[in-house]
């Protein structure tokens, strides 16, 4: 099965899993997705993720979703840069997400990182998504 936007598909699976109050969702594995999930885990938006091998010897990522008092921790996860329209930002011109309460994830020449880390390192890049 091919995807037009595998990152957008990952965000949809997380969003749909939280709407159904699932404990975890399964996502096809890739290094780029692992890097994004690592940032979401470090920032406290998901509990954890781990690599799972399915019966067809395909590797997938099992994401354990996080809730606070029954409500999903992620209120909004939105894809910014899409395959048909890439969005880039310089280090100086990047606004904060929800006045600093949210998070933007960027793909930079030094790897995938949060907007805060990119600002500290004075690096620009492609804005993958914003999370609040």
Predicted feature residues:
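Core subunits and conserved enzymes of cellular information-processing
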Residues: 1-132
